[in-house]
Amino acid sequence: MLRHLRWALLWAGVILWLCLIPGKSLPEWHWFALLDLDKLVHAGMFFVLAVLLAQAFRNGGAPARYVLWAILISAAYGIGTEFMQGLEALGRRSDINDMIANSLGALAAGVFANWRERKGREIVPFGFLR
């Protein structure tokens, strides 16, 4: 099972690194704030994580509700990283809207994974994780 999880774990590490960069190290992107793409980026990060987990669970012979587990684990990870951002040493803050975006990204991945399953296809397109 661990072999199947390698891409999901790698992506989870990237997410953790991105979410826990100290606030003073973050670049100032004024255009980014204007477009408010932040929530889309958050949703996208956890969409990818949930899709990778669902594919890994499927390939590893996980229980029947593996898509639900992928959603729950990804959403919990997203909420946890937001709480960690609230640590004073990082100079950042937790944001409930980011928690919601993270969870919605994981939920959207679950819908996507179920749709791919019903079509009889791999969850991750193009055979990337076979």
Task: List the model feature ranges, each with a label.
Residues 1-96, 103-130:
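Bulky hydrophobic segments
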